[in-house]
C-alpha cells in the first residue's frame, strides 16, 4: 500500500480507491446521489423556529445541553459541529434501518425532512469544548494511525476521508472532539450496527474493512486522539 503524503491527501482520490474495491460501486454512487437529493429537498421547506428550538431541547436531553455528548454507561455521541449532510444521512439511515438503534428510529421517523435539515444546521453551529477523559498516553499513537495509517496492515490514513484535522466533509463525519468511549464502541461494533438493510447500499461499507482490521488497542488509540481535538 502506498501512503499519500499529508499535503497531497484528498478525499476524492482515496475514496475512489476504496469504492473501486467494493462489489457494488454503482449502487453506492446511486445511494450518495439519492442522499444528496433528499437533503436538497429537505432544505426547500421551512419549519417555525419555535418548533425547531423545542425539538433541539428534546435532543439535548440525551446529547447534552451544548450537544457535547454524554459520557455514561451507554455513551451518547457529540453532535456539536457535526457535518449537516452526515447528520441528515444518519437520521435517514435510522428510518431505513440501515443503521440500528431503536431509540433513534423512534425519534427520526417522526421528523420531517425540513426539521431534520434545521436540526442539522443548528448542531453544526455549536462548538463546546471536548469532554475529554481519554488516556493521554494513547494520543501520540492514535495521531500516527489517524494521519499515516498502518501500511503493514493495509489500513489507509483516517485523515484521507475525515481530513487532517478530523473535521470531516459531506457524508464523512466530523470526529473532532468525539467521545472516547463512543468512538471505541462504534468501531468495535461497526458490522452489527451499520449497513443493516441489504436492499439499500450504505456508505458504511467504506469503513467496514478498516473497522474490522484494527485491533482493540489501535481503536482505543485513535479514539483517544480524536477525542482531544478541538
Located regions from the model:
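Bacterial N-terminal signal peptides
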Residues: 21-34
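Electrostatic cytochrome c docking/interface patches
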Residues: 37-56, 68-73, 125-152
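Gly/Gly-Pro-rich "capping" loops immediately C-terminal to redox-active cysteine motifs
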Residues: 49-52, 66-96, 105-110, 159, ...
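N-terminal secretory signal peptides that target proteins for export/translocation
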Residues: 1-20
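The canonical Cys-X-X-Cys-His
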Residues: 57-65, 119, 155-165, 222
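C-terminal capping alpha-helices of c-type cytochrome domains
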Residues: 109-132, 141, 181, 209-230
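N-terminal alpha-helical segment
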Residues: 69-72, 100, 138, 154, ...
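Residue-level hotspots at or immediately adjacent to binding/recognition sites across diverse folds
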Residues: 65, 164, 200-204, 214, ...
Amino acid at each position: 500500500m502506498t501512503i499519500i503524503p499529508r499535503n497531497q491527501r484528498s478525499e476524492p482520490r482515496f475514496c475512489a480507491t476504496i469504492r473501486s474495491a467494493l462489489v457494488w460501486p454503482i449502487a453506492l454512487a446511486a445511494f450518495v446521489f439519492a442522499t444528496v437529493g433528499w437533503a436538497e429537498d429537505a432544505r426547500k421547506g421551512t419549519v417555525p423556529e419555535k418548533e425547531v428550538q423545542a425539538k433541539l431541547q428534546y435532543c439535548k436531553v440525551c446529547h447534552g445541553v451544548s450537544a457535547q455528548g454524554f459520557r455514561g454507561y451507554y455513551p451518547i455521541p457529540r453532535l456539536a459541529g457535526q457535518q449537516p449532510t452526515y447528520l441528515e444521512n444518519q437520521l435517514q439511515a435510522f428510518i431505513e434501518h440501515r443503521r440500528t438503534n431503536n431509540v433513534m428510529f423512534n425519534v427520526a421517523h417522526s421528523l420531517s425532512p425540513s426539521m431534520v435539515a434545521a436540526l442539522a444546521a443548528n448542531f453544526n453551529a455549536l462548538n463546546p469544548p471536548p469532554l475529554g477523559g481519554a488516556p493521554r498516553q494513547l494520543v501520540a499513537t492514535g495521531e500516527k494511525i489517524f494521519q499515516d495509517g498502518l501500511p503493514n496492515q493495509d489500513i489507509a490514513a483516517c485523515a484521507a476521508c475525515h481530513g487532517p484535522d478530523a473535521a470531516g466533509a459531506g457524508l464523512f463525519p466530523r470526529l473532532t472532539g468525539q467521545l472516547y468511549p463512543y468512538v471505541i464502541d462504534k468501531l468495535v461494533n461497526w458490522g452489527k450496527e451499520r449497513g443493516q438493510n441489504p436492499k439499500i447500499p450504505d456508505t458504511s461499507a467504506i469503513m467496514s474493512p478498516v473497522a474490522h482490521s484494527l485491533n482493540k488497542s489501535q481503536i482505543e488509540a485513535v479514539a483517544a486522539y480524536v477525542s482531544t481535538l478541538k
